[in-house]
Amino acid sequence: MIVDNFKQIAEILPEAENPRDSMFLIQLVVRHKDGHLDAANGNNRNRTVRSYQINTVEELLNKEKEIKALCDFFRARAYININPKNTVEVLLKQMELIHQSLVCMWNGDHKVMLRGTLDGALARTGEDDVEFGDVDPQDLALIQTLAEKRHRTWVVDCDDISIVDDVRERINNSRRSIDKVIVAEIPTKSGLHFITYPFDHVTAFDGLEEKLEIKRNSYTLLYFNDEVEGYIE
């Protein structure tokens, strides 16, 4: 099975007026359940083998062949977080993490530290999700308006194909103040990722909580190919 979402992601990736103001994180991940018996890292059964930081759709498409080749070689999956990260905020967070490492008397490879602190800064920047400082989380209209303006999305992970239509209908019928809540539907190996703006998920998904996972500030699938040698069913 091959899942290639490059074209679809390129169509929804937000473009900043100044591309250097924002960046997006791509990770190539090997997973234990894909046949990587050595993928475990502590309690984490996944391992990142390569990361990319891109600023534009053009950069994404320029990296497409390279990313696909590396995924096929390592038997990895490529994931992308389509929530833009503010470049200045990322650099400030990285400086904070570097300072913490030095205070703790880091004595390892400094290249590893720089790479690790950048990945950590990218992962942690934007963790405020849709709360936006002093905005009352109950003010759904304001939250949705700000989310649409700032390109802040959720990933609704649905691994049960039999309920996809029901989930889509519930999201579309949810209480909202913007015209469209669903930004895109991204295929995965076992189901679908609904890329959405924030909505009243508690009411919308009543009775489906155990079948869905809502991921804020998270990744969606960019590329997957288990037709190369080495994958397990």
Give short role names for the model-derived ranges.
Residues 215-216:
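Short, cationic low-complexity segments
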Residues 191-197:
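Catalytic nucleophile-His microenvironment captured as a short glycine-rich beta-strand/loop
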Residues 1-188, 199, 205-207, 220-233:
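Signature for HUH/AEP ssDNA processing cores
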Residues 210-211:
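Polybasic, proline/glycine-rich intrinsically disordered low-complexity segments
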